[in-house]
Amino acid sequence: MTDAPSSPCGQHEALLEALRQTLGAAAILRPDAHDSLDRYQVDWRKRYHGQALAIVRPASTDEVAAVVRLCARHRVSIVPQGGNTSLVGGSVPDDSGQQIVLNLGRLNRVLAVDAANLSMTVQAGCLLAEVQRAADEAGLLFPLSLASEGSCTIGGNLATNAGGTQVLRYGTARELCLGLEAVTAQGEIWDGLKS
């Protein structure tokens, strides 16, 4: 592992340049370059406010892994974010301006629906409403239902173990999950997907 520059400013600029090289400039949003990034830095109730070093929007699991490796190398903490609909502020950066918000909104696809095995493979940034729609189109039911289903994501549902309106009958989000593909804190991709 390469040592990061010692000064915070140099460390941050080196990280941001590495992120631009890895993801492209369009995937990196900076507070100083945009009028408002409140969508990423303030929760939907306007209760929790933060200031990020940058908002990073990867488009693949490999890009997520690369971001995690770069942030670890530069010792910059990450705040993972789905739809930013949480009630507890966990998806909002602190106000230090030194954290990267890792927004998974571009990882938003239903990859497969297997009606025979009653399973689906979806990306972490996929909206709950899209998962429900894909299941319905296959003649199935994805029973997790929340008021925020048009803006909350499956990754956030799993991270918070969302229950929803049918939790007593069908269980929580984690009980509806057969497996995961995840990126470890070291930036390695762990494949625990099953169908």
Annotate each predicted stretch with a short phrase.
Residues 11-22, 76-86, 125, 129-132, ...:
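Short charge-dense sequence patches
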Residues 1-69, 86-118, 133, 147:
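N-terminal flexible segment immediately upstream of the FAD-binding catalytic core
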Residues 109-195:
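FAD-binding subdomain of flavoenzyme oxidoreductases
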Residues 49, 72-74, 81-83, 152, ...:
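Short, basic and Ser/Thr-rich N-terminal targeting/leader segments
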Residues 26-28, 53-55, 75-79, 85-86, ...:
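Structural motif
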